[in-house]
């Protein structure tokens, strides 16, 4: 969807990601797939390169921007990051962190929904265009006592979200257990 929104409407997708390694890996994988229009702004990036990325995002040369919630929320005005670009989508990657880390460890995750709501309102007033919020995770608990799904939906102020629940067991992953007995060779089961 991010590439479609960029190519068809020149809209920007902001991906909120918890770890620098994930951001760098996703940008690198897009580059390997010959999509050079995704960048990240994080503490691994030099100030000069950050400024260059910000200018190119603003100029419409980059269409997907990976940042942390702290980077987004530390800017009182998102235009410091994206200039006059119109947001087409905000993606919250590893969305279970909104509730698991957001309450104590990384509170900017917990306040992300309020900030996204303000961004949406401002963009609607200024450009008469809203944006999609999409969340992705493989580890959220759905319903029950520790219901991360509904807590995340509520924290991010998502109204009537479209939900896809996939199968958690993957056929392409095998688990091998090697038992080692004292002073004996390893045998496989």
Give, region by region, the residue ranges found by the protein language model:
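Conserved helix-turn-beta segment of the N-terminal RecA-like "Helicase ATP-binding" lobe
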Residues: 22-48, 52, 56-59, 150-156
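Conserved RecA-like ASCE P-loop NTPase motor core of nucleic-acid helicases/translocases
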Residues: 12-18, 66, 133-136
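Conserved SF1/SF2 helicase motif Ia
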Residues: 1-37, 42, 122-128
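Conserved catalytic network of the ASCE P-loop NTPase/AAA+ motor domain
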Residues: 5-9, 31-33, 55-60, 80-85, ...
């Amino acid at each position: 969807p991010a590439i479609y929104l960029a190519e068809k409407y020149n809209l920007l997708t902001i991906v909120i990601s918890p770890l620098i390694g994930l951001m760098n890996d996703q940008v690198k994988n897009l580059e390997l797939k010959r999509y050079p229009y995704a960048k990240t702004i994080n503490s691994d990036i030099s100030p000069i390169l950050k400024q260059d990325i910000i200018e190119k995002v603003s100029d419409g040369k980059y269409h997907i921007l990976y940042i942390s919630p702290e980077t987004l929320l530390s800017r009182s005005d998102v235009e410091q990051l994206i200039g006059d670009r119109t947001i087409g989508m905000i993606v919250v990657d590893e969305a279970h962190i909104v509730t698991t880390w957001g309450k104590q460890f990384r509170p900017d995750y917990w306040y992300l929904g309020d900030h996204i709501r303000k961004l949406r309102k401002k963009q609607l007033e200024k450009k008469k265009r809203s944006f999609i919020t999409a969340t992705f995770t493989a580890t959220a608990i759905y319903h029950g006592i520790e219901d991360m799904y509904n807590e995340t939906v509520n924290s991010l102020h998502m109204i009537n979200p479209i939900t896809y629940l996939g199968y958690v067991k993957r056929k392409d992953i095998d688990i091998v257990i090697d038992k080692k007995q004292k002073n004996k060779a390893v045998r496989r089961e």
